[in-house]
């Protein structure tokens, strides 16, 4: 288990997601000043990574080694949070010897940046450079992100924005977890007995939606 001590709860989600990407096989727990005292007492002796935040930067301690970040020497046009994520990525990359294919991007939609830059009229080369330099994304994944973003734009041109709707179907079981993903999911091996009941419930809800949205156009299905 990896226990991370964070001096402020503001960035708990981002820190947890990125640390988990580097230590995919380990349970990752983040403790902050808002963590319950009894849990702090239990986990603090197990801290393996400590992050101290300040207005002008941050300090990360891994074991006995300190890593310092002076935010004033970095162009933080995209905000403190992204600067912190770059610093944390560089630190963990150095400590583990790993480079993640999606860099410091976490979440469920790593193509969002490419999509936004295409809307701004940026060239493929500009987007590629930004994703490599600002988010440490590999060239292969950055090019994939640009390609997918272009396909998304073409598809969204056909959306019925006023008379249509989108359908989201949650599947909480995954055989594996993607490195960039922070979605809540459960290993299918441990919950296999619940799959049939869950699918039955999904079908029931789909029947309800089909009956009650007959006057609208189903544009997209997210699974």
Question: Which functions belong to the PLM regions below?
Answer:
Residues 185-204, 209, 216-223:
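Core AdoMet radical
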Residues 1-101:
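A short, structured N-terminal alpha-helical element that caps or precedes a catalytic domain
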Residues 161-163, 214-218:
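Short helix-loop-beta connector
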Residues 164-197:
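Canonical Radical SAM [4Fe-4S] cluster-binding loop centered on the CxxxCxxC motif
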Residues 96-99, 119-167:
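N-terminal [4Fe-4S]-dependent radical SAM core
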